[in-house]
């Protein structure tokens, strides 16, 4: 039976101590594209967590039967199957969100976080640990998306999840929206400040 302390570490260390975006600087492209709204960031975060977790689980199950020469192909096939399933479910049950996410759900296949956990962890560890590690890393990625999306949507439009938080000048309120935060460069700045803040708080994460 897996050690609960280790499982807890695998699940929660990617949130702060080993965050895929803040420490490993992975998955940046989709973080720029899907964080203009909190709703799309939530769906993307959940999608990545599920794909990363279950792809690691299935890859771990068959790891001893995969010839080394084709392991990347097998990993990609498993990941692509899960991404296709997620994409089809979104189109079936959340079509408008699927349109907003556009090609970025499909591009989960090429996300370095998913491939990285499959190659670095799932190919060496048992299925349960691989599942927890994958979900943890996907959730850590999703957490960063939520923070970035909250800042961008709130400052950029004065709303969160479509609900008005700050009454804008256009609607007779006091808040003047900042259109810069609805553009991709703002995500770079926010992620940069988050990385700076995290490494100031935890100096051991700073690069030598």
Swiss-Prot record:
One of its GO terms (cellular component) is plasma membrane. It is a multi-pass membrane protein. Pfam families: Rnf-Nqr (PF02508). NQR complex catalyzes the reduction of ubiquinone-1 to ubiquinol by two successive reactions, coupled with the transport of Na(+) ions from the cytoplasm to the periplasm. NqrA to NqrE are probably involved in the second step, the conversion of ubisemiquinone to ubiquinol. HAMAP family: NqrD. Composed of six subunits; NqrA, NqrB, NqrC, NqrD, NqrE and NqrF. Belongs to the NqrDE/RnfAE family. This is Na(+)-translocating NADH-quinone reductase subunit D.
